[in-house]
């Protein structure tokens, strides 16, 4: 793997091990907590906009995010370069967090923390579809091959739909969309600046 993608993967695995077997209280400090006025619960802190992405809800959550990072991260890092890749990933993570905070503020309800690298991963998926639009990707179910641009488009639309319809879900669908939107905004900025030969 490329260096930044590898280090993100290692950090996420380390974060998962720490939160589950060494220091479960990390969730109180590092998970993304919504804005609320309940003194008995942890509250939002600025660093949580990034740190939540290194924690995960369970082993399957970690596995699928790290599998996607392994599949798409190195190709994007090779295209962007390591420094720009890191900036891009962090922007996607933060934009996903902001989308989640807005969604939680609008919907309300009992405050629950958000964890996971999915916002960053969805940003990488978007970048992959733009950089390699005609590469074939396979759906898990049903197992249908399709070009990357179509895979990304359908997946993004599905997440947007679920974000407004699956209100009771434990999956932060609009955070996924937020990661893609943040990634797209940064790519458009780079295109405008003409600093990225591939984008």
For each of these PLM feature ranges, what is it?
Residues 1-199:
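A detector for small-residue-rich transmembrane helices and their helix-helix packing motifs
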């Amino acid at each position: 793997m490329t260096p930044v993608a590898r280090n993100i993967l290692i950090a996420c695995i380390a974060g998962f091990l720490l939160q589950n077997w060494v220091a479960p209280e990390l969730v109180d400090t590092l998970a993304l907590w919504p804005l609320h006025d309940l003194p008995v619960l942890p509250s939002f802190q600025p660093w949580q906009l990034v740190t939540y992405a290194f924690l995960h809800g369970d082993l399957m959550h970690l596995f699928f995010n790290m599998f996607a990072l392994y599949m798409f991260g190195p190709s994007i890092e090779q295209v962007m370069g390591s420094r720009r890749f890191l900036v891009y990933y962090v922007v996607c993570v933060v934009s996903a967090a902001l989308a989640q905070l807005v969604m939680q503020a609008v919907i309300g309800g009992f405050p629950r923390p958000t964890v996971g690298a999915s916002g960053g991963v969805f940003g990488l998926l978007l970048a992959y579809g733009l950089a390699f639009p005609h590469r074939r990707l396979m759906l898990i179910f049903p197992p249908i091959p399709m070009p990357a641009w179509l895979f990304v488009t359908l997946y993004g639309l599905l997440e947007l739909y679920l974000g407004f319809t699956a209100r009771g879900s434990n999956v932060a669908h609009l955070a996924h969309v937020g990661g893609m939107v943040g990634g797209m905004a940064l790519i458009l900025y780079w295109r405008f600046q003409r600093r990225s030969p591939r984008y």
